[in-house]
């Protein structure tokens, strides 16, 4: 009887220790140390307020440029597309399997209005990301501010304005899978991770609102 009780106790202990551990960031506060830029710089902003995180970048004013070009007869460009990024260091061991889920709202997708899911972030010039516009999703690797690898998958979105999406990044120790609304968009094999930095970026006249994130260590 005693041996049976010990065996049952051991099974229960193993079950508890093998359970996935999750952390939910609801953005009621900056609990993970996200990099914020509360003022609107000439590149954009990243702000946590009222339970969401909002990332904005700036874009070329094509309408104003067209008017000035027509008036002057000289090709005139007003403004420029900017890149803006925010990140934190996730409560994960990236050497082991994990998944990250983000509930987001996107203002609009276009060829020059992009948003991205950043991970394996070491610093501003060294990171991986899944990024997409209205036509494609890319997996891109940056090393010392240079693109050293890129995989592209064409995608046709049902809507391109005011999108509500759920992004999911799944890593099993070798394979990275990126899902949008439970649909697998891109899979990358034999990819090892080293850094727990994770975040988002926008490019062009883009606004990305992150409502909630769930980090799960499997």
Task: List each model region and its residues.
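Bacterial Sec-dependent N-terminal signal peptides
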Residues: 1-22
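Extracellular carbohydrate-recognition regions
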Residues: 20-43
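Extracellular beta-strand elements of beta-rich domains used
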Residues: 27, 211-215
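Short tryptophan-centered beta-strand motifs in secreted/extracellular beta-sheet-rich domains
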Residues: 27, 100-102, 159-178
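Secretory/extracellular carbohydrate-interaction modules
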Residues: 60-143
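Short, aromatic/His-centered strand-loop micro-motif at the edge of beta-sheets
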Residues: 144-166
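Short strand-turn-strand beta-turns centered on an Asx-Gly dipeptide
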Residues: 179-183
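Flexible glycan-contacting loops in extracellular carbohydrate-active proteins
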Residues: 188-211
């Amino acid at each position: 009887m005693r041996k049976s009780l010990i065996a049952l106790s051991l099974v229960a202990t193993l079950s508890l220790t093998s359970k996935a551990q999750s952390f939910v960031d609801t953005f009621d506060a900056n609990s993970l140390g996200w990099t914020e830029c509360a003022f609107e710089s000439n590149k954009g902003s990243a702000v946590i307020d009222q339970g969401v995180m909002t990332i904005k970048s700036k874009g070329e004013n094509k309408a104003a440029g067209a008017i000035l070009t027509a008036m002057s007869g000289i090709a005139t460009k007003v403004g420029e597309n900017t890149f803006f990024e925010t990140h934190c260091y996730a409560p994960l061991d990236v050497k082991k399997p994990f998944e990250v889920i983000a509930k987001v709202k996107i203002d609009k997708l276009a060829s020059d209005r992009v948003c991205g899911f950043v991970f394996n972030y070491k610093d501003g010039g060294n990171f991986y990301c899944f990024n997409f516009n209205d036509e494609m999703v890319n997996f891109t690797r940056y090393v010392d501010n240079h693109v050293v690898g890129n995989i592209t998958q064409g995608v046709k979105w049902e809507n391109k304005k005011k999108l509500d999406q759920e992004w999911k990044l799944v890593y099993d120790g070798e394979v990275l899978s990126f899902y949008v609304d439970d649909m697998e968009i891109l899979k990358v094999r034999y990819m090892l991770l080293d850094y727990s930095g994770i975040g988002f970026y926008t490019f062009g006249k883009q606004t990305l609102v992150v409502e909630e994130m769930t980090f799960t260590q499997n």
